[in-house]
Swiss-Prot record:
Gene Ontology biological process terms from the UniProt entry: Mo-molybdopterin cofactor biosynthetic process
Domain notes per entry: The N-terminal domain determines nucleotide recognition and specific binding, while the C-terminal domain determines the specific binding to the target protein.
Annotated family: Belongs to the MobA family.
Protein name: Probable molybdenum cofactor guanylyltransferase
EC number: 2.7.7.77
Gene name of this polypeptide: mobA
Keyword Metal-binding: yes
InterPro entries: MobA-like_NTP_Trfase (IPR025877), Molybde_CF_guanTrfase (IPR013482), Nucleotide-diphossugar_trans (IPR029044)
Gene Ontology molecular function terms on file: GTP binding; metal ion binding; molybdenum cofactor guanylyltransferase activity
Length: 198
């Protein structure tokens, strides 16, 4: 058991997905959110951040709303850090159907000498599959109050540990390398269900 919390950001309906809730898109018989919950099962606590908590009752998890709504993923992370019981929280977006248990467990077992532990994949930081220290919430709140809600910009206000290598990644099935891919548009989703490469 990983003594950290995990939070799934399920912000709601996306304009680029014709206002469908991406958490409830299906892939291989499961909703995206079901696939993510399965991948996070070794974390001590799993919560969901959503402004529509009634949609998630079937999962038996605690659901919390944004404290500062309509300010994007930074608001969701801030809310998660205010509600978790542990000192660290893995944050995962609900539109990442390839989240892999081995990857998130590897992140969860890295020594806690950071405020943010953030993977880097294909030369891009991945703040929506990253671990945040609970104490980050105070600076995040100041940013939200000032309507400065750019997530990456805010991340640079903290001590970040960047993870670029996953020693086991070449040993697993090719699809696991897609761990950090997210599905944003109708076309991307249609390609996914047709089993095309993303």
């Amino acid at each position: 058991m990983i003594k950290k919390s995990a939070a799934i950001l399920a912000g709601g309906k996306s304009s680029r997905m014709n206002y469908r809730n991406k958490a409830f898109l299906k892939y291989e018989e499961d909703y995206f959110i079901e696939r993510i919950i399965k991948a996070l099962k070794d974390y001590e606590e799993i919560i969901i951040i959503s402004n529509n908590p009634e949609e998630y009752k079937e999962f038996g998890l605690k659901v919390f709303k944004d404290i500062y709504p309509s300010q994007g993923p930074l608001s969701g992370i801030h809310s998660a850090l205010n509600h978790i019981k542990n000192d660290y929280c893995l944050v995962v977006a609900c539109d990442m159907p390839f989240i892999n248990k081995d990857v998130v467990n590897y992140l969860g077992n890295i020594k806690e000498d950071y405020e943010i532990l953030i993977p880097k994949f294909q030369e891009r930081l991945q703040p929506l599959c990253a671990i945040y220290k609970k104490s980050c919430k105070d600076i995040m709140e100041k940013e939200l109050i000032n309507n400065s809600n750019k997530l990456i910009k805010t991340c640079f206000k903290f001590s970040m540990k960047v993870v670029e290598e996953f020693p086991f990644i070449e040993k697993v099935h090719k699809k696991e390398i897609k761990n950090f891919y997210n599905i944003n548009t109708v076309d991307e989703y249609e390609d996914l269900i047709k089993k095309k490469e993303i």
